[in-house]
Amino acid sequence: MEIEKTNRMNALFEFYAALLTDKQMNYIELYYADDYSLAEIAEEFGVSRQAVYDNIKRTEKILEAYEMKLHMYSDYIVRSEIFDDILAKYPSDHYLRDKISILTSIDNRD
């Protein structure tokens, strides 16, 4: 499994998990976050390996569709880069540092 794809799916899952069904959440979390194999997931849920594979592929497409429409992950990346640039340019500005800290905590809350 490609590390870039795994990282992206985990990130998209963090942003959009609440929009998925319980089954979709379980399969994606086990497959990407917990590194279960298709066979292990199939055994745990009493379904075929093919059923798990199909569900994961559909859920990947759903997560990508949410990102295409909502841009939550890509906007988060852009904000993080801007915050890093500001902190690098104004390292001793405590006002900016405090405001960025507040904005970052908003981005990272559950």
Swiss-Prot record:
Q: Which cysteines are joined by disulfide bonds?
A: none
Q: Cross-referenced Pfam families, in alphabetical order?
A: UPF0122
Q: What does this protein do?
A: Might take part in the signal recognition particle (SRP) pathway. This is inferred from the conservation of its genetic proximity to ftsY/ffh. May be a regulatory protein.
Question: Entry's NCBIfam families?
Answer: PRK00118.1-1, PRK00118.1-4, PRK00118.1-6, YlxM
Which family does the record assign?
Answer: Belongs to the UPF0122 family.
Output the PANTHER family linked to this UniProt entry: UPF0122 PROTEIN CBO2450/CLC_2298, UPF0122 PROTEIN YLXM
Q: What is this protein called?
A: UPF0122 protein SEQ_1180
What organism is recorded for this protein? Streptococcus equi subsp. equi (strain 4047)
